[in-house]
Design a protein with these regions (language model features):
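Canonical Radical SAM [4Fe-4S] cluster-binding loop centered on the CxxxCxxC motif
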Residues: 2-39
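Radical SAM/AdoMet-radical enzyme domain recognition
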Residues: 48-49, 53-62, 71-175
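Secondary-structure boundary/capping micro-motif
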Residues: 36, 44-47
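Active-site neighborhood of divalent metal-dependent phosphoester/pyrophosphate hydrolases
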Residues: 66-67
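Serine/threonine-rich low-complexity intrinsically disordered regions
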Residues: 3, 40-43, 136, 141
Length: 175
C-alpha cells in the first residue's frame, strides 16, 4: 500500500485573520451554518485510529485551517498521544502544519521541535505586499508579528518553510 497522507482541519474555517483572498471566511459567511466549530478530541481520536489502521510504511498527517493553532496545543498533544497509542503497524509518522504564524509563541515552537513537526508559515512577500492582503479583523497588517515569530522559530530550531500567495497586485506594490 502506498504511504497515506491525511489533511485534518481542526478549526474548520475559523481564523484570527481576515485575508482578502481567503475563501473560507467568505464561504462561511454565506452558509446557513457558518462554521462547523472545532474538531472534538473524540473525532480526532477516531481519525487517527482509522488512518493508522490502514497505514503501512509511512503516514503524513497535515493540519491546516482556517487557522489550526486556534485549536490550541492540548489538541495537538492529544494527536501525538493518539498516534503513539494506535500506531500498531509501527509506521513512520510525519506531522506538518500550515499556519498564518500570528499565534505562535515559545510554547508552540517547543512543541513543534519536541514532536518533529514541519511548520509552513504563510508570508506574502515584504511588509507592503503581505499587509495588503493579510489583515487582522480590525484591519491592521500582520507582517511584523509574523516576522517576529519566524525569527523565534529559527532560534528555537523549528523545521519550517514559507508559503506565499502571489498576484499581479503583489507585483505592483513596491517593497
Amino acid at each position: 500500500m502506498p504511504p497515506i497522507s491525511v489533511l485534518i482541519k481542526p478549526s474548520s474555517g475559523n481564523c484570527n485573520l481576515r485575508c482578502e483572498y481567503c475563501f473560507y471566511y467568505d464561504t462561511m459567511s454565506k452558509r446557513e451554518q457558518g462554521a462547523y466549530g472545532f474538531m472534538s478530541v473524540e473525532t480526532l481520536e477516531d481519525v487517527i485510529r482509522q488512518v493508522l489502521a490502514y497505514s503501512e510504511g509511512s503516514c503524513t498527517i497535515a493540519y491546516q485551517g482556517g487557522e489550526p493553532t486556534l485549536s490550541g496545543i492540548p489538541f495537538f498533544e492529544k494527536s501525538i498521544e493518539f498516534q503513539e497509542k494506535y500506531n500498531v503497524n509501527n509506521v513512520k509518522i510525519f506531522n506538518a502544519i500550515q499556519t498564518n504564524g500570528s499565534l505562535l509563541d515559545k510554547q508552540w515552537a517547543e512543541f513543534f521541535v519536541r514532536n518533529h513537526f514541519l511548520v509552513g508559515v504563510s508570508l506574502d512577500g515584504g511588509p507592503k505586499q503581505h499587509d495588503y492582503y493579510r489583515k487582522t479583523p480590525a484591519g491592521k497588517g500582520s507582517f511584523t508579528r509574523i516576522m517576529e515569530n519566524i525569527e523565534m522559530l529559527k532560534k528555537t530550531g523549528v523545521d519550517f518553510n514559507i508559503l506565499s500567495f502571489s498576484s499581479p497586485v503583489c507585483g505592483s506594490i513596491v517593497v
